[in-house]
Amino acid sequence: MTSQLHKKGEAWSARFSEPMSELVKRYTSSVFFDKRLALVDIAGSLAHANMLAAQKIISADDLAAIERGMAQIKGEIERGEFEWQLDLEDVHLNIEARLTALIGDAGKRLHTGRSRNDQVATDIRLWLRGEIDRIGGLLNDLRGALLDLAEQNADTIMPGFTHLQVAQPVTFGHHLLAYVEMFSRDAERMRDCRTRVNRLPLGAAALAGTSYPIDRHAVAKTLGFDGICANSLDAVSDRDFAIEFTAASALVMTHVSRFSEELVLWMSPRVGFIDIADRFCTGSSIMPQKKNPDVPELARGKTGRVNGHLMALLTLMKGQPLAYNKDNQEDKEPLFDTVDTVADTLRIFAEMVAGITVKPDAMRAAALQGFSTATDLADYLVKRGLPFRDAHEAVAHAVKVCDDRGIDLADLTLDEMKQELPNVAHLIGEDVFGYLTLEGSVASRNHPGGTAPDQVRAAVKAARAALGQ
C-alpha cells in the first residue's frame, strides 16, 4: 500500500476527504523556523530507536538502517543540502520522510511508541539545554571583562548617584562590581532553570503514554537528562521551562539595559567619563562630528523585545486545557529569538567592555561637585559625640551656605567652618579636612561590600575564584 506520507504529503491525511488548502499549509507550517531543531531531533530519534531495539520492539536490522539513514540526513543538513518541504509541515516529518525515502519500511517504524507531541517537547528541551550552557559561558565572559575593568579602576574615583544626583564618592571599580553581582545572579538563575529543563518528556506519546514496553529511563540516560517527566499529560503540554528561561533572559536583558543607560550617559560629551571603541559605534549621515553609542542603545531596545516574548509565552499558555494544543507551535519563535538576542547581546557586550577607555580626570572632577563628602562631615561629627540627626542638620546648613557662595565644603577654612557651625564648633578640628577629601571618603568604607580600593580588589579576587569554580 502506498504510504499516505508520500502520496499526499501529510502523515495524517488518510482520515480526510480533501487535501489541505495551500493557505492553511502556509499558516500551520513551522518547518522554516523549527528546522533549527533538526540535529537534536536526530539525536532524540536515535536514542528512541536504540531503546526500541533494546526492548525488542524493532529489529537490530531496522536500528542499523535507521542509524545509517540518520547519519546521511545529518550530513545533508550540516552541508546545507537537505531539501526542506513546506508540505511536510515541520522538522520532524521532513526528517522522517527523508529517512523513509532512504531506508524504506524501517524508517516508518521509527515513530513506534512516539508522538510528535512528546517528540517536539524533547527536542525543545534538548536544544534549550545546550543554549543555556552557551549563555552561561557568555555570562562568564562578560563578568570576566567587567572584573578586569574593575580591577584596573579600583582606585578611580567617580560620583555615586541617587536620583541621578551626586550622592557620595565611589570607585569606578566598585560601581562595575555591582553589575558583576547582577550577572552572577543571572548565571545562577540559568543554572537553576536548567535543572527543570533537563527532564525527558519522550515516552508520554500523544498524551496518555504508550502500550509498548518502552524504557524511558534508558532514553533519558542516553540523552543526558537528569530524569523523566513524571506525568504524561504534563510532559507534552508543559512549557513552564520555556517561560522560566525567557523570564531569566528578561532579567539578563534588564541588567544589560541598566548598564547600557549608564554607558550612553557616561559617553555623552557633557559627562565624558568613558569612551567606547569606534568599532562599537556609528556616525551620522548629516552631522560629521557624531559618534553614537548604537550598541548600548540597541540593547536597551532589544530588552523590550525579550520582555515581549515573555508576555507572549505567558499569554500563549494561560488558556490551554490539557493536554497538547496547536497553540504550542507558537512557543518556538519567541523562544528562539530570545536565545539569539541574549546570546548576541552578551557576546558583543563582553567585547565592548574590554575596549572601554576610562577618563579618570573627568570622573574625579564630577565627584568634586555636588557636595559628595557631606555625609563624611556628618559622620565626623557623630564620631565626636553628636547625635546623627543633629549632625545631619548642621551639615545641611553648611551645604546651603557653601552652595550660595558657589564653593564646596572643603573650600571653607577651619575658622569659616566653625563660624558657620557655631553649635558644633568645639567638635571641629584641623583633621576634619581629611574626611572631606575624595580619597579619604572612599577609603573609610573599608568593609566587605564597601567601596574602599582594598575592598574592591578583594571582591574582584573573590569573584574571579567563583567564576573558576
Swiss-Prot record:
Pathway per the UniProt entry: Amino-acid biosynthesis; L-arginine biosynthesis; L-arginine from L-ornithine and carbamoyl phosphate: step 3/3
Q: Which EC number applies?
A: 4.3.2.1
Q: Name one GO cellular component term.
A: cytosol
| Compartments it resides in | Cytoplasm
Instruction: Please verify whether the record's keywords include Nucleotide-binding.
Output: no
- Primary location group: cytoplasm
Q: Which Gene3D superfamilies match?
A: Fumarase/aspartase (C-terminal domain), Fumarase/aspartase (Central domain), Fumarase/aspartase (N-terminal domain)
GO BP, one annotated term: arginine biosynthetic process via ornithine
Give the keywords, sorted.
Amino-acid biosynthesis, Arginine biosynthesis, Cytoplasm, Lyase
Q: Please tell me whether the keyword Lyase is annotated for this protein.
A: yes
Q: What reaction is this protein's catalytic activity?
A: 2-(N(omega)-L-arginino)succinate = fumarate + L-arginine
InterPro entries, sorted: Arg_succ_lyase_C (IPR029419), Argininosuccinate_lyase (IPR009049), Fumarase/histidase_N (IPR024083), Fumarate_lyase_CS (IPR020557), Fumarate_lyase_fam (IPR000362), Fumarate_lyase_N (IPR022761), L-Aspartase-like (IPR008948)
Any one GO molecular-function label of the UniProt entry? argininosuccinate lyase activity
Membrane spanning stretches:
none
One Pfam family hit: ASL_C2
| Family designation | Belongs to the lyase 1 family. Argininosuccinate lyase subfamily.
* Alphabetized HAMAP family for the sequence: Arg_succ_lyase (MF_00006)
Please identify the protein, giving its name as recorded.
Answer: Argininosuccinate lyase
Which organism's genome codes for this protein? Answer: Burkholderia lata (strain ATCC 17760 / DSM 23089 / LMG 22485 / NCIMB 9086 / R18194 / 383)
Taxonomy, top ranks, is:
Bacteria, Pseudomonadati, Pseudomonadota, Betaproteobacteria, Burkholderiales
